[in-house]
Amino acid sequence: AQNKGSDDCGGFLKNYSGWISYYKALTTNCVWTIEMKPGHKIILQILPLNLTCGKEYLEVRDQRAGPDNFLKVCGGTGFVYQSSHNVATVKYSRDSHHPASSFNVYFYGIPQGAKA
């Protein structure tokens, strides 16, 4: 799950914990799907962001909580997102003429009843 500076654009991550980091590919939309064991939820820690708002963003979506349950960010001091179930997605999207910026997201799983 460590994609730091790689050409990996998205993928399916089943690790208990790991990193999703900026990529250097030409692709403008990358989606990482994170899946934990049943009975677990996912904690995502988005480290401080400095993306170019209006040209690129990160979106975190809880796959089983409905279409309106997501976080979309382009800048800030950092965010923590907790899924309600064991599957979540992280999407990086940018305009085709805009260079990719760096970002780092740490994720890990915890049992459903536990607090982050």
Curated annotation (Swiss-Prot):
Keywords: Disulfide bond, Fertilization, Glycoprotein, Heparin-binding, Methylation, Secreted. One of its GO terms (molecular function) is heparin binding. It comes from Sus scrofa. Belongs to the spermadhesin family. InterPro entries: CUB_dom, Sperma_CUB_dom_sf, Spermadhesin. The keyword Disulfide bond applies. This is Carbohydrate-binding protein AQN-3. The modification Methylhistidine is found at H85. AQN proteins mediate the binding of boar spermatozoa to component(s) of the egg's zona pellucida by a carbohydrate-binding mechanism. AQN proteins are secretory components of the male accessory glands being coated to the sperm surface at the time of ejaculation. They possess as well heparin-, serine-protease-inhibitor-binding capability.
